[in-house]
């Protein structure tokens, strides 16, 4: 009987120990989650300065904002891109001179949506770099600098240089690029300190975007799927980001020279 009592006691202690362990584990997860989203960690996902909660932001001739500024005669576009995506790089390289000039003269505003859309191929590359793009847009009011950083990032030579680096080496390279473009040490440190928050925003956006019905209406593809680069204006369907006819299918609509209905199909 004493032997059975001892077994019951040991069994009870085991259950109690497991219960305490489980409680502490769950409590720690809650604490860690709250800390991850608290002001103490300086993660800006809950209260971004210049960007939206999905990491998107608008570049114009004057500043960086969360939404388009209503101005007559200004063309507005949404631009979804992944820094690892070959077509995203190709389109950016072909259009960046026009976009840069149009941002300067105020004839165009673009809401950029950095994504982690190719994570199955790129590992942490797309996530890390997209987070840096959103982060720099969040801490800076200089739209010209941010677009120059994007042009350096959406570049084949840069991709080849960075894509196989470890996390630490990749961040060092990105920091060097940001410094060369002219971001202050304070701005760069702010992004580095808050990078997990920006990564969280990018990941959430990249997952949620696949569930949004609006892209089925905008997509020029037969299967109505979302793809990158996904670029669309206030009216019409998205441009054909996979097209080899850059002048007619991409630059033409961006310049307002070719109606989207003629090139986006």
What are these regions (language model features)?
Residues 70-86, 92, 109-114:
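Short active-site neighborhood of thiol/selenol oxidoreductases, capturing the structured segment around
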Residues 2-36, 175-265:
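C-terminal cap of thioredoxin/glutaredoxin-like
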Residues 75, 83, 130-131, 229:
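Residue-level detector of short, conserved catalytic/binding motifs and their immediate flanks
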């Amino acid at each position: 009987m004493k032997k059975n009592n001892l077994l019951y006691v040991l069994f009870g202690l085991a259950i109690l120990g497991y219960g305490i362990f489980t409680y502490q584990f769950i409590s720690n997860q809650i604490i860690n989650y709250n800390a991850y989203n608290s002001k103490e960690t300086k993660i800006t996902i809950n209260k971004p300065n210049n960007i939206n909660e999905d990491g998107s932001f608008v570049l114009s001739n004057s500043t960086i904002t969360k939404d388009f500024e209503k101005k007559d005669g200004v063309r507005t576009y949404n631009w979804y891109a992944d820094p690892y995506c070959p077509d995203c790089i190709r389109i950016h390289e072909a259009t960046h001179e026009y976009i840069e000039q149009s941002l300067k003269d105020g004839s165009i505003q673009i809401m950029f949506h950095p994504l982690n859309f190719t994570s199955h191929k790129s590992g942490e590359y797309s996530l890390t770099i997209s987070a840096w793009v959103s982060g720099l847009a969040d801490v800076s009011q200089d739209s010209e600098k941010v677009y120059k950083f994007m042009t350096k990032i959406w570049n084949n030579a840069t991709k080849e240089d960075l894509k196989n680096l470890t996390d630490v080496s990749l961040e060092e390279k990105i920091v060097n690029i940001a410094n060369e473009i002219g971001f202050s040490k304070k701005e760069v440190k702010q992004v580095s300190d808050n990078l997990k928050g920006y990564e969280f925003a990018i990941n959430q956006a990249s997952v949620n975007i696949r569930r949004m019905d609006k892209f089925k209406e905008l997509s020029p593809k037969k299967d109505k799927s979302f793809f990158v680069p996904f670029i669309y204006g206030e009216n019409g369907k998205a441009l054909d980001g996979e097209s080899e006819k850059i002048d007619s299918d991409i630059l033409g609509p961006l310049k307002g020279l070719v109606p989207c209905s003629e090139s986006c199909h």
